[in-house]
């Protein structure tokens, strides 16, 4: 889905305005089936937890989890070769702008929480759901599941401790935790059952 160029209101608490360039951001988080295609094509070794996830056919259309930051980066590199275009993780500002839209919404669909539009604690699912399960929870630009279901790695630089950042909250987070502005530090080498990722495809004139 296109993230249009412009100035976006961002931030949790103290808001700021960021000017962003145009990119294509994934409509959904990357599904398990896509990562299985990647590992089958490349022969890349994976952790035991991720291996079990990839073998679970009933979750092929769920967002992949149990992926480290390096797993996500390697998938992007493979996808770039397959597509012949630059592919990477969304930067934090891009991710938040795609979720909040030009309106600067609290949740992707608006400023009033609705557990029927996402997968979080209040929704009652207790596990991941298919990536296309909540079209009614889409952001104004069309990206879906940017609130809940799984946290998503973003491509911001590591902090002083080497930790990376995840965005969006998961099925284990409450309404407050799945706000568009929500971000958490995460150990890049520790995959979890609540973390996946989403890709960005750059236009030819983006850096």
Where on the chain are the PLM-derived regions?
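Short, structured beta-strand segments at or near domain termini in extracellular proteins/domains
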Residues: 194-206
């Amino acid at each position: 889905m296109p993230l249009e160029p412009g100035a976006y209101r961002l931030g949790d608490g103290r808001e700021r305005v960021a000017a962003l360039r145009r990119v294509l951001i994934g409509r959904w988080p990357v599904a398990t089936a896509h990562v299985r295609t990647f590992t089958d094509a490349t022969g890349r070794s994976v952790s035991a937890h991720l291996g079990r996830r990839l073998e679970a056919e009933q979750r092929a259309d769920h967002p992949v989890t149990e992926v480290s930051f390096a797993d996500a980066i390697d998938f992007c590199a493979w996808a770039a070769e397959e597509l012949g275009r630059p592919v990477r993780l969304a930067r934090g500002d891009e991710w938040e702008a795609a979720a909040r839209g030009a309106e600067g919404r609290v949740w992707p669909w608006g400023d009033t929480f609705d557990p029927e539009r996402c997968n979080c604690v209040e929704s009652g699912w207790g596990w991941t759901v298919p990536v296309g399960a909540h079209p009614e929870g889409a952001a104004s630009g069309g990206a879906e599941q940017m609130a809940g279901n799984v946290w998503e790695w973003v491509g911001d630089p590591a902090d002083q401790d080497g930790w990376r950042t995840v965005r969006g909250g998961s099925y284990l987070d409450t309404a407050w935790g799945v706000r568009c502005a929500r971000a958490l530090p995460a150990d890049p080498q520790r995959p979890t059952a609540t973390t996946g990722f989403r890709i960005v495809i750059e236009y030819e004139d983006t850096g």
